[in-house]
Amino acid sequence: EYFAGVAKYDFGSIVKKLDDKSSFGFSFIRFGVDNIPNTTELIDAQGNINYDRITYFSAADLAFIGSYGKKVNDYLSVGGSVKIINRKAGDFAKAWGFGVDISSTYKKNDWGIAIVAKDVTSTFNVWNYELSNEMINTFNSTGNELPENGLELTLPRVILGVFKNYEFEKNVHLLIEFNSDITTDGRRNVLISGNPFSIDPHIGAEFNIRDLVFLRGGFGNIQKTPDLTGKMIYTIQPNLGLGINIKGVEIEYALTDIGDASIAEYSNIFSSTINLNPE
């Protein structure tokens, strides 16, 4: 659950090795907010408020993703994904979209660098609205602009990362990573804000004990926000995580925004992975 339970993020995937150097996967993602009150018919024809006329709907994004990855040599790996996106808000707004992501990782000794280019061709979403006569009348009477069918573009984003692995003793490791999101859609409220490029840095670490227990922590979402006096200050979002791997079954938990340090609400994230051919 994201943002103190307001939104729900569901993810599932299956991955199959094609050979010793390549694999293919299929993933499904749903991110949505459910039980949103629809008050467009709250007031009846006589001008009376009738709460029984309130209905509820969901606003959700669905993604169907096919991915392929290949190990080029002992140091370099490359991969890519094709995604089909379905977005909807109740029965009155729907969109279909298409996008492509590519990535590459280079590792040598205990160092590594990685790059992910998301929405490299820009992701296209074609919106179609089907409003009832009651909704159109409500929009007009309240001075709201009627939505129009159109095309939504998600511009490319590049994620650059560098990581270092430290080995303290046999099967005990510490991995430290620094990465940055580079967006291309104009000025954003991030640490380095510009037009058209903005840079949002993150740092994280994972303590690995015998590939059985994983302790994780990190910082990100650095933003400039007003405090109680109206003075602009920088806020940062701390996150913690725990992972357990037992005989090919991995259980992961993460808690974001520890102590409500940033302007965002906290999120609880659970995931599990089953390896059908554990080594």
Predicted feature descriptions by range:
Residues 1-279:
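Subset of outer-membrane beta-barrel
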